[in-house]
Amino acid sequence: MEKIIIDAEQFQRTISRISHQIIEKHSSLDNLVLVGIKRRGAEIAEMLQSRIAELAQTELPLMALDITFYRDDLHLDHQDPVYTGVESQIDITGKNVILIDDVLFTGRTIRAALDALLDFGRATRIELVILVDRGHRELPIRADYVGKNIPTARTEQVQVRTQFYDGMNQVVLIRAKDE
């Protein structure tokens, strides 16, 4: 069973609110770099980049990060992993990085992303943007900017759908069939 928990209008308002929060928190945007975790985190990063440009008249550098080979669960996947590379590689040394992903669950994706970021330099600071925080952390990771906190059961799934990949912007909660 599927339940829409963020519709298209709420999705855009959430992107706008997070953009405002980023601008308010940083006295200057000159040293900021947006890094989106592929796939949907990268698309959300593009949305934030666009909205921040509208609000602050400045376009932040953007990098899409593939964390495939940094994951700690590669041995569980029986398919050969496909690395899609990094788009617009940026040296993040001395930069304030805003790391962006769609859903925060166990924290393992973010840990992998932090490991991957080290290959691009030593950032001054890394902040985390998450569209949906669903809880159930296995690692001590906390987001600096959260679109929406959605308490879930471990058996449920939170699926972020974006225009590029899914033809719409929304977030749905998918319950297991036996619940």
From Swiss-Prot:
Belongs to the purine/pyrimidine phosphoribosyltransferase family. PyrR subfamily. One of its GO terms (biological process) is regulation of DNA-templated transcription. The lineage of its organism: Bacteria, Pseudomonadati, Pseudomonadota, Gammaproteobacteria, Pasteurellales. It is an enzyme of class 2 (transferase). The keyword Transferase applies. Its EC number is 2.4.2.9. A motif (PRPP-binding) lies at residues 97-109. This is Bifunctional protein PyrR. It catalyses: UMP + diphosphate = 5-phospho-alpha-D-ribose 1-diphosphate + uracil. InterPro entries: PRibTrfase_dom, PRTase-like, PyrR, PyrR_bifunctional. The gene is pyrR. GO terms for molecular function: uracil phosphoribosyltransferase activity. It comes from Actinobacillus pleuropneumoniae serotype 5b (strain L20). Regulates the transcription of the pyrimidine nucleotide (pyr) operon in response to exogenous pyrimidines. Also displays a weak uracil phosphoribosyltransferase activity which is not physiologically significant. HAMAP family: PyrR (MF_01219). Keywords: Glycosyltransferase, Transcription, Transcription regulation, Transferase.
